[in-house]
Curated annotation (Swiss-Prot):
Name by which UniProt lists this protein: Nuclear pore complex protein Nup93
Known role: Plays a role in the nuclear pore complex (NPC) assembly and/or maintenance. May anchor nucleoporins, but not NUP153 and TPR, to the NPC. During renal development, regulates podocyte migration and proliferation through SMAD4 signaling.
Taxonomic superkingdom: Eukaryota
A GO term for molecular function: structural constituent of nuclear pore
Family: Belongs to the nucleoporin interacting component (NIC) family.
Membrane topology category: Peripheral membrane protein
PTM sites of type Phosphothreonine: T49
Keyword terms: Membrane, mRNA transport, Nuclear pore complex, Nucleus, Phosphoprotein, Protein transport, Translocation, Transport
Compartments, record wording: Nucleus membrane; Nucleus, Nuclear pore complex; Nucleus envelope
Quaternary context: Part of the nuclear pore complex (NPC). Component of the p62 complex, a complex composed of NUP62 and NUP54. Forms a complex with NUP35, NUP155, NUP205 and lamin B; the interaction with NUP35 is direct. Does not interact with TPR. Interacts with SMAD4 and IPO7; translocates SMAD4 to the nucleus through the NPC upon BMP7 stimulation resulting in activation of SMAD4 signaling.
C-alpha cells in the first residue's frame, strides 16, 4: 500500500514538473535539499507566529476575564482614543466667524505663552545644569590635582607600583619620614627661625640652603648659585610684591643678574675646557679673559672656518674673539680685540665704545638706528655668524634670528635673547627689532613650554630657563611636581617669600600656579600656603617639630575667614600627631605649665592652645580638649567638657584601667587642684561638676554593696525626695539641673529604690522583736521605707523629664513588693 502511494506521488510530481517545463515564460528555479528545508522552516515559522499570536490573545482574554475585564471592549476603547495632542494646530475658521476667530486668537495667545514659558524653563534648567557640571568638574580637577601633588609619585607618573598593603602605613615611633637632604634643609630652617625668634639680624636664607647643596649633586649647587644671583636685587619701595616685580628698575636688574650668571657660567665652562686640554689649548701670555678665549678657540676652532670675515688677530677670527669675550662677560677684553682690528671694522669701534660705556648697555637712539640700518643693508645675509651675532646684540636688532650657528645651546640662546631685551619704547624701533621681557617670557612658558625642553630628561634646564627670565613661580611649580626635587622647590619658594619677591595667590583655594585678573599677562602667582602644607603633609605625623618650623613662615598669613594660618596649621598638626605635651607643653602636678616647642615662637601661648582645644572639641575629642583648656587656664571650658565626659560613665561599674576609672581620676585631680588653688568656674557648671563627682562616689559605693553609705550620700545630695514634705522642693530644684544630671536620673532612681528594697528585705529577714529592738521600732522603720519608696514613685511622675518605660515598671514593681 505504501509502495503504491509513493509511486502515485512520484507520478504526480513528474507530471507537475513536465507541465512546469512547458511554460516557457516562467524562469526555472532549481533547489537542493538544504534550500528546500530552509524554505519549509520559514513557512512553518510564519504559521507558528500566527498561531502564537492567537494563543497569546486567548491567554490575555482568560487573564483579564478572570478580573472582570472584557478585552474586546478594551480594544475598541483604545482604538477610539484620539492621538491628537493639546498643542495641535487649531482648526481654521471662516473669515466671518467672529466668535471662532476670537476663540482661536485667545487659544493661540495662551498656547504661545505656554510654549514660550516651556522653552525658557528648559533653557534655564539646561543652563543651570551646565553651570553646575562645570563647577563640579572644576572641584574634581582641584581634588585630582591636590591628590597628585601630595602623592609620593610624580604628577603624571601612572606606572604600576607594588601591591598595596592593607596594614597601617603609620611609621613606627621614632622613625623619620625625611630623607637626608630634607633633614639637612630642615636643620637650616631651624637655624634660620632660631635667629629670627631670638631677635638677631635676619640671616641669609639663601646661604643656609645653598650649604645643603654640598651634600647633593652639581645641578643642585648650580641651582642655588643661580637663585642667589637672581635674588641679589634692590627692590623698589612698594606695598606688595606685584608692584615691586612690575617696576622697570627691578625687571632690568633681573635681566642684568641673569646675564651675569650666564656669563660667569660660560667662563667657568671655558676654564674647565682649557685646563682639560692644555696641550691643544696652548695657554700662555698675560692671564685674563683674552688669553683664555684665545686658548679656548684653539680647541673650538682649530682650523680656519669658511665664511669668517675681517681678518684675524693672533691667528684667530676677529669676530669669534669679540663674541666669546662678550660671552664670558668681559667687554674690556672684547675692546682689546676691537682696538687691534679697528682698521678692518670701520665704524664698529665707535659703536662698541658707546655700548661699553653706557649704563644699561644701550646705544643712543640715533646710533642704534644707524647700526640697524647698516645691519639690514650689509649684514643680514652675511656669512660670518659671529659678526651677525655681535651686531644683533649691540644693536638689539633682528630678534627673529636665533643665531643657531653660534648659540647652539639653550644657555647661549638665553644669553643672546636677554641681551636683546629692551625696556624703553622710543617709538623708533620696528617690531622685528623690539623684544620685551614679557614677550620673551610668554615665548618660553607658553609657546615652547615643557615639551620643547624635554623636561623629563633635563628638569633643571627648564627650571633654569624659567628662573633666569624672572618666572620664579612657574619654575617652582614645575620643580615641585617632581617628587625627588620637591624639597628644593619648596626651599627656593621660602627664600623668595622671605625676600618679598614671591607673588602669592590671593586665596588658599587657588591652584598651585594661577593667573589672577588684573595681573600682567606673563605674571603667575604661586599658592605658597598650599605648597608648604603639601610638603609638610609627608612628615608632619612623624616629625612634628620640623613641620612646626615650616609653619612659622605662615605667621603673617590669613585664610579666607581671616584666621591666622600659623594657628590653624599648628592646631591641625597637634591634632594629627597627638603630640600635645611636646608641642604645647604639659601641666605639672602643682599646676604650673612645662613649656613646649611652641613657646619658642611666641610668648603668649594661650591663643594657640585655646585654638587647638577648640579644634579638638569640634572634632569630638573632648578629653584632649579638656586637657588643653586646662593648659590654657580656661576653667569654664574644662569643667564644661568634663561634665560631658563624666555624665555617660556615672552609673557604670568601676574597673581597673576602664574608661570610667581614667575619667574619674582625671576629674578628681582637677577638683583637688582647683580647690587647692582657689580656681572657680561658672557657678552652674561648677556645681554640676562636683555633683557628678558625688554621684560617681554614690554609684561606686552602691556597686560595692555598701548600701548604707550609698544611702547616706544620696540623702545628703538632696537630689531625690525621701519624704513627702520635700517633694515640692526637689521637683522645683530638678528644673535647675543640667542635662548631664538629668540623663542619670533613671539610674539614680533605680539605685535608690534598690537600696530601699534591700533595706526592706533585710528588715523583714531580721529576728522578731527584742528588748533592744521593740516591735514598734521595726514597724516605724517599715513604714518609713514604704513612704520613701512611694515618694520616689511620685517624684518620677512629677518631674518634667521622660524616663523610660522599663525604669517606671521596675520602680513600681519594687514598690509593690515592699507593700
Amino acid at each position: 500500500m505504501d509502495t503504491e502511494g509513493f509511486g502515485e506521488l512520484l507520478q504526480q510530481a513528474e507530471q507537475l514538473a513536465a507541465e512546469t517545463e512547458g511554460i516557457s515564460e516562467l524562469p526555472h528555479v532549481e533547489r537542493n535539499l538544504q534550500e528546500i528545508q530552509q524554505a519549509g522552516e520559514r513557512l512553518r515559522s510564519r504559521t507558528l507566529t500566527r498561531t502564537s499570536q492567537e494563543t497569546a490573545d486567548v491567554k490575555a482574554s482568560v487573564l483579564l476575564g478572570s478580573r472582570g475585564l472584557d478585552i474586546s471592549h478594551i480594544s475598541q476603547r483604545l482604538e477610539s482614543l484620539s492621538a491628537a495632542t493639546t498643542f495641535e494646530p487649531l482648526e481654521p475658521v471662516k473669515d466671518t466667524d467672529i466668535q471662532g476667530f476670537l476663540k482661536n486668537e485667545k487659544d493661540n495667545a495662551l498656547l504661545s505663552a505656554i510654549e514660550e514659558s516651556r522653552k525658557r524653563t528648559f533653557g534655564m534648567a539646561e543652563e543651570y545644569h551646565r553651570e553646575s557640571m562645570l563647577v563640579e568638574w572644576e572641584q574634581v580637577k582641584q581634588r585630582i590635582l591636590h591628590t597628585l601633588l601630595a602623592s609620593g609619585e610624580d604628577a603624571l607618573d601612572f606606572t604600576q607600583e607594588s601591591e598595596p598593603s592593607y596594614v597601617s602605613d603609620v611609621s613606627p615611633p621614632g622613625r623619620s619620614s625625611l630623607d637626608s637632604i630634607e633633614m639637612a634643609y630642615a636643620r637650616q630652617i631651624y637655624i634660620y627661625n632660631e635667629k629670627i625668634v631670638s631677635g638677631h639680624l635676619q640671616p641669609n636664607l639663601v646661604d643656609l640652603c645653598a650649604s645643603v647643596a654640598e651634600l647633593d649633586d652639581k645641578s643642585i649647587s648650580d641651582m642655588w648659585a643661580m637663585v642667589k644671583q637672581m635674588t641679589d636685587v634692590v627692590l623698589t619701595p612698594a606695598t606688595d610684591a606685584l608692584k615691586s616685580r612690575s617696576s622697570v628698575e627691578v625687571r632690568m636688574d633681573f635681566v642684568k643678574q641673569a646675564l651675569g650668571y650666564l656669563e660667569q657660567s660660560y667662563k667657568n665652562y671655558t676654564l674647565v675646557t682649557v685646563f682639560g686640554n692644555l696641550h691643544q689649548a696652548q695657554l700662555g701670555g698675560v692671564p685674563g679673559t683674552y688669553q683664555l678665549v684665545r686658548s679656548f678657540l684653539n680647541i673650538k676652532l682649530p682650523a680656519p672656518s669658511p665664511g669668517l670675515q675681517d681678518g684675524e688677530v693672533e691667528g684667530h677670527p676677529v669676530w669669534a674673539l669679540i663674541y666669546y669675550c662678550m660671552r664670558c662677560g668681559d667687554l674690556l677684553a672684547a675692546s682689546q680685540v676691537v682696538s687691534r682690528a679697528q682698521h678692518q671694522l670701520g665704524e664698529f669701534k665707535t659703536w662698541f665704545q658707546e655700548y661699553m660705556n653706557s649704563k644699561d648697555r644701550r646705544l643712543s637712539p640715533a646710533t642704534e638706528n644707524k647700526l640697524r640700518l647698516h645691519y639690514r643693508r650689509a649684514l643680514r645675509n652675511n656669512t660670518d655668524p659671529y659678526k651677525r651675532a655681535v651686531y644683533c646684540i649691540i644693536g638689539r636688532c633682528d630678534i627673529t634670528d636665533n643665531q643657531s650657528e653660534v648659540a647652539d645651546k639653550t644657555e647661549d640662546y638665553l644669553w643672546l635673547k636677554l641681551n636683546q631685551v629692551c625696556f624703553d619704547d622710543d617709538g623708533t624701533s620696528s617690531p622685528q627689532d623690539r623684544l620685551t621681557l614679557s614677550q620673551f617670557q610668554k615665548q618660553l612658558l607658553e609657546d615652547y613650554g615643557e615639551s620643547h625642553f624635554t623636561v623629563n630628561q633635563q628638569p633643571f634646564l627648564y627650571f633654569q630657563v624659567l628662573f633666569l627670565t624672572a618666572q620664579f613661580e612657574a619654575a617652582i611649580a614645575f620643580l615641585f611636581r617632581m617628587e625627588r626635587l620637591r624639597c628644593h622647590a619648596v626651599h627656593v619658594a621660602l627664600v623668595l617669600f622671605e625676600l618679598k619677591l614671591l607673588l602669592k595667590s590671593s586665596g588658599q583655594s587657588a591652584q598651585l600656579l594661577s593667573h589672577e585678573p588684573g595681573d600682567p599677562p606673563c605674571m603667575r602667582r604661586l599658592n605658597f600656603v598650599r605648597l608648604l602644607m603639601l610638603y609638610t603633609r609627608k612628615f608632619e605625623s612623624t616629625d612634628p617639630r620640623e613641620a612646626l618650623q615650616y609653619f612659622y613662615f605662615l605667621r603673617d598669613e590669613k585664610d579666607s575667614q581671616g584666621e591666622n594660618m600659623f594657628l590653624r596649621c599648628v592646631s591641625e598638626l597637634v591634632i594629627e600627631s597627638r603630640e600635645f605635651d611636646m608641642i604645647l607643653g604639659k601641666l605639672e602636678n602643682d599646676g604650673s605649665r612645662k613649656p613646649g616647642v611652641i613657646d619658642k615662637f611666641t610668648s603668649d601661648t594661650k591663643p594657640i592652645i585655646n585654638k587647638v582645644a577648640s579644634v579638638a572639641e569640634n572634632k569630638g575629642l573632648f578629653e584632649e580638649a579638656a586637657k588643653l583648656y586646662d593648659l590654657a587656664k580656661n576653667a569654664d571650658k574644662v569643667l564644661e567638657l568634663m561634665n560631658k565626659l563624666l555624665s555617660p560613665v556615672v552609673p557604670q561599674i568601676s574597673a581597673p584601667q576602664s574608661n570610667k576609672e581614667r575619667l574619674k581620676n582625671m576629674a578628681l585631680s582637677i577638683a583637688e587642684r582647683y580647690r587647692a588653688q582657689g580656681i572657680s568656674a561658672n557657678k552652674f557648671v561648677d556645681s554640676t561638676f562636683y555633683l557628678l563627682l558625688d554621684l560617681i562616689t554614690f554609684f561606686d559605693e552602691y556597686h560595692s554593696g555598701h548600701i548604707d553609705r550609698a544611702f547616706d550620700i544620696i540623702d545628703r545630695l538632696k537630689l531625690v525626695p525621701l519624704n513627702q514634705e520635700s517633694m515640692e522642693e526637689r521637683v522645683a530644684a530638678f528644673r535647675n539641673f543640667s542635662d548631664e544630671i538629668r540623663h542619670n536620673l533613671s539610674e539614680v532612681l533605680l539605685a535608690t529604690m534598690n537600696i530601699l528594697f534591700t533595706q526592706f528585705k533585710r528588715l523583714k529577714g531580721t529576728s522578731p522583736s527584742s528588748a533592744t529592738r521593740p516591735q514598734r521600732v521595726i514597724e516605724d522603720r517599715d513604714s518609713q521605707l514604704r513612704s520613701q519608696a512611694r515618694a520616689l514613685i511620685t517624684f518620677a511622675g512629677m518631674i518634667p523629664y521622660r524616663t523610660s518605660g522599663d525604669t517606671n515598671a521596675r520602680l513600681v514593681q519594687m514598690e509593690v513588693l515592699m507593700n
